[in-house]
A protein has these predicted regions:
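N-terminal amphipathic/basic-hydrophobic helices that include classical n-h-c signal peptides
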Residues: 1-19
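N-terminal auxiliary segments of SAM/dcSAM-dependent transferases
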Residues: 17-50
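Residues that form generic nucleotide/phosphate-binding pockets
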Residues: 35, 39-42, 56-60, 89, ...
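Short, compositionally biased "basic patch" segments
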Residues: 47-63, 131-137
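Non-catalytic interaction surface on structured domains
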Residues: 50-54, 65, 71-72, 103
């Protein structure tokens, strides 16, 4: 007789041991997904929960919380919720090319490349002003290196942009992640230059929008640079959204992102 914990009894935690009963349990996958969507939308409207989450994130940032995580042995410098959200987006949309500005230690490009490896196609193009030799060595010696291309140079420099475009085959589905310099003007320039590369149905992700929710008196001081409200990614994103009708803020993904450094930063491309 089989022993399993079935979805139909998950609220009580009861075990089902009757195989015939197992076969009669309804397929509730659609209902489960619909309920998750409903709760995500509701969570995204709960400002009190968001405030509590912000307080918690600022508290753990004293320990440089985002720096404590790695992916396949490489520091990723992201919060777990953002890693999960990016995974959901990539698996759902299956981009052929993912462009990320801001390589840092390489964990993020390795992470996205590993998902493309599971999908069975595609590559990640990592762009950074300064790719340190030891970080390059880590990335280029990694098992996922075959799906990674590194471009060193200012992300919005015409020569860099030309090299990035050269990595995009015709008719590719293109996703973009912006995670380099977080000043308003730089992010806005990246949005204007990289936004047009994103194809319909794919995502444009603007990292570290959380800074736009933090008062200057509470802004983390343990960084090489400090950004404040008005000079950060969220302000740039809002300006960009007023300039284009190609993108919308995904309410489901962003609704879940309360313990996140990028709330409101996941934009879905809705027009060619």
């Amino acid at each position: 007789m089989g022993l399993s914990l079935r979805a139909g009894n998950s609220e009580t935690g009861d075990f089902v041991t009757d195989r015939e009963t197992d076969l009669k349990i309804a397929d509730d996958r659609g209902q489960f997904a619909a309920r998750a969507r409903e709760l995500s939308l509701a969570l995204g409207k709960d400002q009190e929960v968001f405030k509590q989450a912000l307080d918690a994130l600022l508290a753990v940032d004293n320990y440089r919380y985002a720096y404590l995580w790695s992916w396949m042995g490489v520091p990723i410098i992201q919060l777990p919720a953002d890693i999960m959200a990016t995974q959901e987006v990539i698996v759902a949309t299956k981009p052929d090319v993912i462009i990320e500005t801001g390589v840092a230690r390489g964990g993020s490009v390795v992470f996205m490349a590993s998902l493309l490896e599971l999908i069975g196609r595609g590559k990640v193009v990592g762009v950074d002003l300064d790719i340190r030799p030891h970080n390059r060595q880590t990335i280029e010696s990694h098992p996922m290196a075959k799906r990674i291309r590194l471009i060193e140079g200012p992300s919005t420099d015409p020569e860099t942009l030309a090299r990035v475009r050269g990595e995009i085959p015709p008719d590719s589905n293109v996703m973009v992640v912006l995670d380099s310099d977080h000043s308003r003007d730089h992010v806005l320039s990246e949005l204007r230059n990289y936004g047009p590369l994103v194809t319909k149905g794919q995502y444009l992700v603007v990292a570290d929008t959380l800074v736009g929710h933090i008062d200057e008196s509470r802004a983390p001081k343990n960084r090489s640079k400090t950004w404040f409200k008005g000079d950060e990614p969220l302000t740039a994103l809002n300006i960009f959204l007023q300039e284009t009708n190609r993108f919308e803020v995904d309410p489901v993904i962003n609704g879940k992102l309360v313990f996140s450094s990028s709330p409101g930063g996941y934009l879905r491309c809705i027009a060619p």
